[in-house]
């Protein structure tokens, strides 16, 4: 697995794509977008071991145990709860988590779905 090919993202406000694979393609083509967070396999494992994904799982009922576990699509109803949970966690000051929170805030403001593509 490529060390830098895992993403947490939402589409930009001016982008309307309904096909899931096209959303993934868009994210890879727009990796520098403010709405795309690139995350390594090692980071996924580290945060799993530290309990970050458990916080998200408690809200979404989608359980992630490590890389290649599949994809999460976080619906609009859960995004606010996930954002608040992360902001109130011990992880909230870490740069990667700050970037994830930014994507969640953007998604809330622009009514977008957030995708965890692991």
UniProtKB/Swiss-Prot annotation:
CDD domains: DMP12. Gene3D superfamilies: 3.40.1760.20. It holds the Pfam family DMP12. Transmembrane segments: none annotated. One of its GO terms (molecular function) is metal ion binding. Coiled coil: none annotated. The shape and electrostatic surface of the DMP12 monomer are similar to those of the straight portion of the bent HU-bound DNA and complementary to those of HU protein dimer. Acts as a DNA mimic. Interacts with the DNA-binding protein HU and partially prevents the binding of HU protein to DNA by occupying the DNA binding sites on the protein. However, the relatively weak affinity of DMP12 for HU suggests that it may not completely block the HU protein-DNA binding, and that DMP12 is more likely to act as a regulator than a competitive inhibitor. It protects HU protein from limited digestion by trypsin in a limited trypsin digestion assay, suggesting that it may serve to protect the HU protein and improve the stability of unbound HU protein. Monomer. Interacts with the dimeric form of the DNA-binding protein HU. Belongs to the DMP12-like protein family. This is DNA mimic protein DMP12.
């Amino acid at each position: 697995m490529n060390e830098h090919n895992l993403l947490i993202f939402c589409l930009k406000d001016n982008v309307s794509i309904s096909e899931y694979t096209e959303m993934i393609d868009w994210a890879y083509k727009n990796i520098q977008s403010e709405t795309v967070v690139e995350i390594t396999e090692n980071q996924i494992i580290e945060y799993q071991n530290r309990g970050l994904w458990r916080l998200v799982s408690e809200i979404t009922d989608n359980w992630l145990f490590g890389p290649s576990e599949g994809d999460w699509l976080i619906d609009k109803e859960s995004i606010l709860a996930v954002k608040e949970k992360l902001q109130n966690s011990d992880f909230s000051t870490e740069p990667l988590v700050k970037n994830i929170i930014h994507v969640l805030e953007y998604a809330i403001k622009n009514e977008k779905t957030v995708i965890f593509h692991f």
